[in-house]
């Protein structure tokens, strides 16, 4: 393998990871059509992902340490996964995704209080830009208020809030527990998502098992999604550890492109001009945030790209 190909592999890893996250909503809808609810799908796919990480990276289990931040990571990962899965199953995929992508605004606020990072004027401006984009997208002449109009959109918003918190807590864990490998933080994320999804499914009621041949199909899809989630996280961690943070953030935005295209092809969802404009503000804020925060720790210190994980599909 020549140097040019080897050098492009980390970028390709992030690109593939973003594409997978942009497409994963579709098999979740197939599961829903087979009778597997969003909460149950969240629990089962996360359980498969958790087991996959534990088995594939079993040598890192010895680095697991206790800290109060780990339950926080587990809970926020659970809310993130459940909100994203439920929202993309029951709502307009692109709108849910864009509400989720308000993450930079919430991250700036959380990091100020939990990581003692100074909230600069630039950071506050980017937060305002992304929130303004969401208000533009959500504004309706009939409703009069720029608020999520459906439970699915509220779920997407909650997922973004929780994802931002889980990101901040993962960074804090990497600082407090530098000896704990990133794979164990990823396992904590998936384990928390599995437990939270299982608890939530109890309140939703136990659905009837898919009948006949549908049961085998549902099991195969659940296992495939879970393994894909875990593999995708490990793949993206490989890329983020070797690509500058500002460049990686730009590549990750490809997820929105894939989401928009797949929503158009598979769900016949076409955003309005106002939704495109609001989405553009959110994407721009995400893009610029990588430049505002481009002063990242050195790759051999805690908090580098290897700490990045996403316990959601």
Each language-model region and where it sits:
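Juxtamembrane C-cap of transmembrane helices in multi-pass membrane transport proteins
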Residues: 19-35, 82-91, 99, 113, ...
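Membrane-interface helix-cap regions at the ends of transmembrane helices
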Residues: 4, 49-66, 132-147, 192-218, ...
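Hydrophobic alpha-helical transmembrane segments of multi-pass integral membrane proteins
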Residues: 9-13, 38-55, 129, 154, ...
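Helix-helix packing/entry segments at the starts of transmembrane helices
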Residues: 98-102, 173-192, 229-265
């Amino acid at each position: 393998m020549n140097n040019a190909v080897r050098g492009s592999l980390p970028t390709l890893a992030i690109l593939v990871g973003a594409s997978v996250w942009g497409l994963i909503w579709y098999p979740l809808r197939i599961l829903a059509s087979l009778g597997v609810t969003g909460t149950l799908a969240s629990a089962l796919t996360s359980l498969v992902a958790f087991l996959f990480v534990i088995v594939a990276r079993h040598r890192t289990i010895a680095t697991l340490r206790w800290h109060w931040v780990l339950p926080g990571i587990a809970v926020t990962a659970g809310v993130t996964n459940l909100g994203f899965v439920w929202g993309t199953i029951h709502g307009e995929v692109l709108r849910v995704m864009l509400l989720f992508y308000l993450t930079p605004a919430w991250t700036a606020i959380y990091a100020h209080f939990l990581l003692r990072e100074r909230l600069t004027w630039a950071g506050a401006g980017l937060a305002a830009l992304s929130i303004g984009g969401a208000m533009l997208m959500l504004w309706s002449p009939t409703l009069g208020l720029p608020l999520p109009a459906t439970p699915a959109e509220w779920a997407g918003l909650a997922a973004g809030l929780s994802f931002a918190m889980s990101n901040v807590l993962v960074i804090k864990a990497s600082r407090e527990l530098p000896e704990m490998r990133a794979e164990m933080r990823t396992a904590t994320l998936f384990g928390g998502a599995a437990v939270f999804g299982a608890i939530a499914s109890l309140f939703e009621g136990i659905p009837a098992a898919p009948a006949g041949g549908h049961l085998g199909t549902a099991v195969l899809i659940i296992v495939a999604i879970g393994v894909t989630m875990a593999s995708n996280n490990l793949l993206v961690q490989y890329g983020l550890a070797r690509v500058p943070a500002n460049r990686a953030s730009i590549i990750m935005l490809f997820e929105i492109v894939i989401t928009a295209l797949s929503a158009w092809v598979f769900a016949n969802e076409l955003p309005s001009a106002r939704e495109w404009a609001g989405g553009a503000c959110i994407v721009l804020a995400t893009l610029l945030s990588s430049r505002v925060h481009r002063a990242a720790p050195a790759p051999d210190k805690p908090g580098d790209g290897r700490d990045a994980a996403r316990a959601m599909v």
